[in-house]
Amino acid sequence: MTRFRLGLVGAGRMGQVHVRAAAESSLVEIAAVADPIAASRLNLAGNGIKTYETAGDMIEAGEVDGVLIATPSNTHVDTVADIAARGLPILCEKPCGVTAEEARKAADVAERYKVHLQIGYWRRFVPELKQLRDDIRAGLLGNLYLVSCFQWDEAPPANSFRATGGGAFIDMGVHEFDQMRWLTGQEPTNFRVATSKTTFAGAVKGDPDAVQLLCDLSDGSSGLVSLGRRFPPGDACWTQVFGTSGFAEARFFWPPDGEAVFLNALQAQLEDFVQAARGGAPRGATASDAVAALTIAEAATELLSRDLNKAEGNNVR
């Protein structure tokens, strides 16, 4: 079968990772890349990858079958709209906008032009998590008490990013919110948040080093999302599930093997997107899933902001 020719919009860090993930696939190839920054384009030039300054130029060349969007989050909606109007299927990196309203706009424009839009929540393609989901859905753990999802980074990003990135619940937590919904089939509600005052690289207003969200799930169980900016062993993600018939833990992204898990999941996600673009049943996240994750992230961020402002007011007194 001829490999699906994917055009990449955005040649930054995540775009470069996608190129690596696609390199071993027999179903899909990154055939072209568009990025307005010449140096970024040069990083991916060669190996048969053609480069363009704009997505429009890339598509008009007529050599791509679909588009992968890996631009900054605040450009996702406009980029989706541009590609959808040209009739090509789209795989957009998470979170598909920086607000739930933006994700809704992306969903609407994809529906208007009748194009397939998939969102890059790659954890749905991690075999260990897929097995955990199957076990939960089959009732092997019984009725659930608690589902806990953790994401802790080795070191925080630059303070300039933290000050403008929307905070941990948006730039990190959307993965956990999507993962919790996907694993359990339940909707999180009734959110409560907590923070730690401990700092590693200096306090950043509005973005504590560690934040936690406790919620109810619609089946009557509880959910916990734990996000941290500093985990010395390395970037790590893991999940724990407590039920009436058992306990399960998935340390699916754990030093030093996290990168291999990441690349394999990204490759599986790309190949699933190709199958869906060719008319198969999609398994990846939809724009509606993106809306749901961002809705939770916005609610959590609002609660966090309220609590931080209250604490700041108390300190002033």
Curated annotation (Swiss-Prot):
Keyword line: NAD, Oxidoreductase
GO cellular component: cytoplasm
InterPro entries cross-referenced by the UniProt entry: Gfo/Idh/MocA-like_OxRdtase_N, GFO_IDH_MocA-like_dom, NAD(P)-bd_dom_sf
GO function term, MF aspect, one: oxidoreductase activity
Disulfide bonds: none
Enzyme Commission numbers on file: 1.-.-.-
This protein's name: Rhizopine catabolism protein MocA
Species of origin: Rhizobium meliloti
